[in-house]
Swiss-Prot record:
The keyword Transcription regulation does not apply. Residues 118-135, 186-192, 253-270, 368-371, 426-428, 493-495 are extracellular. GO terms for molecular function: choline transmembrane transporter activity; ethanolamine transmembrane transporter activity; heme B transmembrane transporter activity; heme transmembrane transporter activity. It comes from Mus musculus (Mouse). Ethanolamine binds at Q207, Q476. The gene is Flvcr1. This is Choline/ethanolamine transporter FLVCR1. The chain crosses the membrane at residues 93-117, 136-163, 166-185, 193-221, 227-252, 271-300, 337-367, 372-400, 403-425, 429-458, 467-492, 496-518.
Length: 560
């Protein structure tokens, strides 16, 4: 029997009933003239066009009668040009492109550099405070500008992704990242803090075109058995950049001189020149790498593979472009209660991670004076452990498809990890902080791809870029709030524990919201055939593509 998700269905064996939603088509009828019509529609009830006495319509629905097996054959017509041949002779509808690994690697690398530029100031905040002669709040804003820029720009960036595609979005992200890196190279003088801020603003705009791409890249290029792992790998690139941002700056730009009575570093002229040289080395190295990756993006990053990698992507490709509405997509997501709950809970978790990452150097140095290098290494441990968690979570999702259960368990374990990290900071053993930071990072950072993939599942067939963009918007807004609030609480009470407890309270709220999410795995149901698909429209002649297209309505009948 022909199936709705087949591009070219096999002929129905004589004497067997037709599939739901299909009418028999006379053998030899031209593909461009025959149509798929709605079940219970007027043409279906009247026997369909051009079928004459072959079909008798009853009041309860059309009854397909094959008058002569030699003369008539029931089949599902192909979406484009094709011959009436059995399914085994047809080309496969879906296929995996070897280029998918190249695209994923390029994206992960320039995402890595962008994340490195985000955290490179905060990981040695005391050094930059003294070099530019500014307050800790100024350095914190070099991190928070990433969050501020994201909120107003995510909607035009998402519109661009949905209307112009992956390639242009990738070029903008990589290009602006490169431009920002070069601007910073001109800021290595003590009175040019505003120039380094300008470069950071450009990098923060680039981030808008980067953070929302893991899910679209994974969905467009990877098959259903590897999509979660691919998304986790794409997120991994960003996490690795954060890890490198904690590791390299303390090594490339070590603190020089001795502290004076104000707590700032007292520099001689020679020390200042050496510090400027070290900062220059870091900035120029970043700029050269960013330039190389930008040219690599131009050469090798393609829009999409020749054939869709999954049935879910094939259905979306068959939908005519006229059917997509940006405003309707936003409205549909806002009315999706499970997505709204995930939106807030994801924002809490990721915002807490942003706050911890931004303030980690200040938190560690409160208890362990002079341990700038180890503070960076603790940040590295936190992120590397999270990278391992991300990959394991992605593999687990591809194997089990237990999105809600996994998300909830990881959320609870992140909360427990945060409590352990908070109440072991003041023990006086920095090795303990390494260990507890690793536990915290494994679960907190490992949660990030879970949120992306869970959102795509419960919002399909809405744009992956839209759902990812809204998740990141919530994360940026709450990241700004948490960073400012935690920083002030830590300063007022002179205790990082108070600020961490503030984050723990919010994470507990996130656990409750996650538990309330209804798990309706729409994309998974399409790929496994658990969702009822009714072909309910005739082929559409698009102004863009002259080939007929089939419009599909998805009706989910199960909630896993």
């Amino acid at each position: 029997m022909a199936r709705p998700d087949d591009e070219v269905g096999p002929a129905v064996a004589p004497g067997h009933p037709l599939g739901k939603g299909y009418l028999p088509v006379p053998k030899g009828a031209p593909d461009g003239e025959a149509r798929l019509v709605p079940q219970n529609g007027p043409e279906a009830l009247n026997g369909g066009p051009g079928l004459g006495p072959l079909i008798a319509g009853a009041q309860g629905g059309p009854q397909a009668l094959i008058a002569a097996e030699e003369e008539t054959q029931a089949r599902l017509l192909p979406a484009g040009d094709g011959e009436d041949v059995p399914c085994p002779a047809c080309p496969p509808r879906t296929a995996l492109s070897p280029r998918r690994f190249v695209v994923l690697l390029i994206f992960s690398l320039y995402s890595l550099v962008n994340a490195f530029q985000w955290i490179q100031y905060s990981s040695i905040s005391n050094v930059f405070e003294d070099f530019y002669e500014v307050s800790p709040l100024h350095i914190n804003w070099l991190s928070m500008v990433y969050m501020v820029a994201y909120v107003p720009l995510i909607f035009p960036a998402t519109w661009l992704l949905d209307t112009r595609g992956l390639r242009l979005t990738a070029l903008l992200g990589s290009g602006l990242n490169c431009l920002g890196a070069w601007v910073k190279c001109g800021s290595v003088q003590r009175h040019l803090f505003w120039v380094t801020m300008l470069g950071q603003i450009l990098c923060s705009v680039a981030q808008v075109f980067i953070l929302g791409l893991p899910s679209p890249v994974a969905s467009v290029w990877f098959g259903p058995k590897e999509v979660s792992t691919a998304c986790a790998t794409a997120v991994l690139g960003n996490q690795l950049g954060t890890a490198v941002g904690f590791l390299l700056p303390p090594v490339l730009v070590p603190a020089l001189g001795t502290q004076n009575s104000t707590g700032l570093l007292a520099h001689t002229q020679n020390n200042t020149d050496l510090l400027a040289h070290n900062i220059n080395t870091m900035f120029y190295g970043t700029a050269f790498i960013s330039t190389f990756l930008f040219f690599l993006t131009i050469i090798a990053f393609k829009e999409k593979p020749p054939l869709p990698p999954s049935q879910a992507q094939a259905v979306l490709r068959d939908s005519p472009p006229e059917e997509y509405s940006y405003k309707s997509s936003i409205w549909n997501l806002c009315r999706n209660i499970p997505f709204v709950l995930l939106l807030v809970s994801y924002g809490i978790m990721t915002g807490a991670f942003y706050s911890i990452s931004t303030l980690l150097n200040q938190i560690i140095l409160t208890y362990y004076v002079g341990e700038e290098v180890n503070a960076g290494r603790i940040g590295l441990t936190l992120v590397v452990a999270g990278m391992v968690g991300s990959i394991l979570c992605g593999l687990w999702l591809d194997y089990t498809k237990t999105y809600k259960q996994t998300t909830l368990i990881v959320y609870v374990l992140s909360f427990i990890g945060m409590l352990i990290f908070t109440f072991t900071l003041n023990l006086g053993y920095i090795i303990v902080v390494f260990f507890t930071g690793g536990i915290l990072g494994f679960f907190m950072t490992g949660y990030l791809p879970l949120g992306f993939e869970f959102a795509v599942e419960i919002t399909y067939p809405e744009s992956e870029g839209m759902s990812s963009g809204l998740l990141n918007t919530a994360a940026q807004i709450l990241g700004i709030f948490f960073t400012l609030a935690q920083g002030k609480i830590t300063t007022d009470y002179n205790s990082p524990e108070a600020g961490n407890i503030f984050l723990c309270a919010w994470m507990f709220v996130g656990i409750i919201l996650t538990a309330l999410i209804k798990s309706d795995l729409r994309r998974h149901n399409i790929n496994t055939g658990l969702t009822n698909i009714d072909v309910k429209a005739v082929p559409v002649d698009s102004r863009v593509d002259p080939k007929p297209k089939v419009m599909v309505s998805i009706q989910s009948e199960s909630s896993l």
